[in-house]
């Protein structure tokens, strides 16, 4: 299969590791399903398994998940998808967001901790759910509580020394926070949100990572499905109650109309190359030299087909300029005060 060969050969070294990863990886947030604080609505596990296996068959060689996705369910689905596969992908997961009966019935289901014992317990639980002996990349999900990040990072460094994880990284950290923990142990990678609608990391964080050989695997390059080309106002209106996007400003007016207008520009640019709007959105993030690879979610095999081409697609300079012009001419609208 030619596309599998093409995707597989476009690998990049992740930071200070020996891992050569494909330009896009499979993001497993949505396959955690609904019925939790940051859920995406109901999800068929068979569709999830098919999506993962199809992505791997097409050459994607890494999966990013987290213990908290679906309150452990995402990791279990990943394990199911990998059963019996001879060639296993790299598996990345994350810690720091935990749940228990104490918090289950409260409005905020998730409790955050970077205490030594908590991190160790999370790792053991992730290894069990993923059915793995070692995690390829173990990441702190959020720098919260901030006064515990040193203790959490020291614990990850110790787990690496013990051989339970191969490399360690962080997600959603600022430059100042990375400076603090880098005195304890080197950072292999940062996982920040980055898309044409969320560019806050461009000024300081991405240049810092590039300067310090910290790999960058950005999440939400398609803004949680908004830039895929499949999103409409009608579809947004029909989001289930347990889909976190219902309450996100980018999926509400006045931003929604502006964002869907951007999608039409991406559709126009992509059509000249046989690419989807989502592939254009992903390729735009990969154009930044500080970005190693992008995390891309899919909930079924068909969605994988709509994003796989981003691994090799490169935007022309004039196309990048058209996107920049649109974003400049159409700033984020502010909802009028009542």
Predicted region positions:
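N-terminal binding-site loop/beta-alpha segment at the start of enzyme catalytic domains
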Residues: 1-89
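Beta/alpha (TIM)-barrel catalytic core signal, keyed to glycine-rich beta->alpha loops juxtaposed to Asp/Glu
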Residues: 3, 143-328
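Acidic (Asp/Glu)-rich catalytic clusters
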Residues: 16, 80-87, 128-131, 160, ...
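Alpha-helix N-cap and loop-to-helix initiation/capping positions
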Residues: 39-47, 73, 77, 110-118, ...
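Short, acidic/polar
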Residues: 41-55, 113-130, 174-180
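A short, structured active-site edge motif that brings together acidic residues
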Residues: 88-100
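Surface-exposed, active-site-proximal loop segments in enzymatic domains
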Residues: 100-113
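Active-site groove signature of glycoside hydrolases
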Residues: 127-145
